[in-house]
């Protein structure tokens, strides 16, 4: 039976309690071999096989928990992290943390948008206009960098309705596909910030056992991300075309070359390629003389 008593020597990790980022974090931990007892009704979860404790909180609470040293690690969108950091610095508060790694999920962009019928050439068209946003500090920094004065209107939700409701002339909000903007009669005109999820650590040094566990997790995360970006490729190649075929497949290391039974003119080539393999690449391999081309996904990888 798993011991779920809170222990001071557990590595404490703060994650978003619900939403797409929460799901992606759960998948990442599973891929890293961390077995978590998830319970949607509980805000604290525990690992079965490692001394890890998960705190499930609001996403905008995670930076503060890291800044204040309440938790050891956190996974958060860079947009939320940057907004909270700018807010604290604006209040003359000290902000310290370590950004360990950008992750390969949580992609989004913070963009300016206006009514689809508005004439827009550049950000200076928004001079002295009211802009609704949930990210006032990121917006202010961008506008200051471009030397544009504006009026900020803070909204914590439903930012897209601000122009049609007469609340603001423009908005600054997160965009993924742009479908929500289009549904509300808006058009995206400028991207002010691009974001992914990232892994952060509190600034204060961890005790050696916790730091060793962090290092282990980092190694596993790196392996998971490299595996997602790589493919294991097997093919047959004429010996005289090896150099040309190898050049089409940039790999982690040199390819493995194996002899083929009863065939002295060709060899089998195995390689882990870091580039995404598209149909065009496979067609180029075939044109170069390769045959029996097999492309396989990689679940885990460690150099």
Swiss-Prot record:
InterPro entries: ATP-PRT_HisG_long, ATP_PRibTrfase_cat, ATP_PRibTrfase_CS, ATP_PRibTrfase_HisG, HisG_C, N-reg_PII-like_a/b, N-reg_PII/ATP_PRibTrfase_C
Catalysis: reaction(s): 1-(5-phospho-beta-D-ribosyl)-ATP + diphosphate = 5-phospho-alpha-D-ribose 1-diphosphate + ATP
Enzyme Commission identifier(s): 2.4.2.17
Cofactor(s) the protein requires to work: Mg(2+)
Gene3D superfamilies tied to this protein: 3.30.70.120, Periplasmic binding protein-like II
GO cellular component: cytoplasm
Superkingdom of origin organism: Bacteria
PROSITE patterns attached to this UniProt entry: ATP_P_PHORIBOSYLTR
Pathway: Amino-acid biosynthesis; L-histidine biosynthesis; L-histidine from 5-phospho-alpha-D-ribose 1-diphosphate: step 1/9
Main location: cytoplasm
Keywords noted in UniProt: Amino-acid biosynthesis, ATP-binding, Cytoplasm, Glycosyltransferase, Histidine biosynthesis, Magnesium, Metal-binding, Nucleotide-binding, Transferase
Protein location: Cytoplasm
Any one GO molecular-function label of the UniProt entry: ATP phosphoribosyltransferase activity
BP GO terms, sorted: L-histidine biosynthetic process
Known regulation of activity: Feedback inhibited by histidine.
Family assignment from sequence similarity: Belongs to the ATP phosphoribosyltransferase family. Long subfamily.
Task performed by this protein: Catalyzes the condensation of ATP and 5-phosphoribose 1-diphosphate to form N'-(5'-phosphoribosyl)-ATP (PR-ATP). Has a crucial role in the pathway because the rate of histidine biosynthesis seems to be controlled primarily by regulation of HisG enzymatic activity.
Protein name from the UniProt record: ATP phosphoribosyltransferase
Source organism per UniProt: Haemophilus influenzae (strain ATCC 51907 / DSM 11121 / KW20 / Rd)
């Amino acid at each position: 039976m798993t011991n779920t008593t809170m222990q001071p020597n557990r590595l404490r990790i703060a994650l978003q309690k619900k939403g797409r980022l929460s799901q992606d974090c759960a998948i990442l931990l599973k891929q890293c071999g961390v077995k978590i007892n998830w319970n949607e009704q509980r805000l604290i979860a525990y690992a079965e096989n490692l001394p890890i404790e998960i705190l499930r909180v609001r996403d905008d609470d995670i930076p503060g928990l890291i800044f204040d040293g309440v938790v050891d690690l956190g996974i958060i969108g860079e947009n939320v992290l940057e907004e909270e950091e700018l807010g604290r610095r604006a209040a003359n508060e000290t902000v310290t943390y370590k950004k360990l790694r950008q992750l390969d999920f949580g992609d989004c962009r913070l963009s300016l948008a206006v009514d689809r019928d508005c004439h827009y050439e550049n950000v200076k068209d928004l001079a002295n206009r009211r802009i609704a946003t949930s990210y006032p500090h990121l917006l202010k920094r961008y506008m200051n960098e471009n030397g544009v004065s504006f009026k900020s209107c803070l909204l914590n939700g439903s930012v897209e309705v601000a122009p049609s409701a007469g609340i603001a002339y423009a908005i600054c909000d997160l965009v993924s596909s742009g479908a929500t903007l289009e549904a509300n009669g808006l058009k995206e005109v400028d991207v002010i910030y691009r974001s992914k999820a990232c892994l952060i650590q509190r600034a204060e040094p961890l005790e050696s056992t916790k730091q060793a566990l962090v290092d282990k997790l980092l190694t596993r995360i790196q392996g998971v991300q490299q595996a997602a970006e790589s493919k294991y490729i097997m093919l047959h190649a004429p010996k005289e075309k090896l150099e040309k075929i190898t050049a089409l497949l940039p790999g982690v290391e040199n390819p493995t070359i194996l002899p083929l039974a009863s065939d002295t003119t060709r060899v089998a080539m195995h390689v882990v390629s870091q580039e995404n393999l598209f149909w065009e690449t496979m067609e180029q391999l075939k044109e170069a003389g390769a045959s029996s081309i097999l492309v396989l996904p990689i679940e885990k990888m460690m150099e």
